[in-house]
């Protein structure tokens, strides 16, 4: 169960990083 939460939080973090990365690229 703990491993599942770690993987889930990791995927969520990557999604947020990609989302904000694309937004910053569009702003520039």
Swiss-Prot record:
Family membership: Belongs to the PetL family.
Annotated Pfam families: PetL
Keywords: Cyanelle, Electron transport, Membrane, Photosynthesis, Plastid, Thylakoid, Transmembrane, Transmembrane helix, Transport
GO-annotated biological processes: photosynthesis
Function: Component of the cytochrome b6-f complex, which mediates electron transfer between photosystem II (PSII) and photosystem I (PSI), cyclic electron flow around PSI, and state transitions. PetL is important for photoautotrophic growth as well as for electron transfer efficiency and stability of the cytochrome b6-f complex.
Source species: Cyanophora paradoxa
Recorded topology in the membrane: Single-pass membrane protein
InterPro entries on file: Cyt_b6/f_cplx_su6 (IPR007802)
Transmembrane segments: 2-22
Subunit (UniProt): The 4 large subunits of the cytochrome b6-f complex are cytochrome b6, subunit IV (17 kDa polypeptide, PetD), cytochrome f and the Rieske protein, while the 4 small subunits are PetG, PetL, PetM and PetN. The complex functions as a dimer.
GO molecular function annotations of the record: electron transporter, transferring electrons within cytochrome b6/f complex of photosystem II activity
Signal sequence interval, chain numbering: none
Protein name: Cytochrome b6-f complex subunit 6
Superkingdom, natural source: Eukaryota
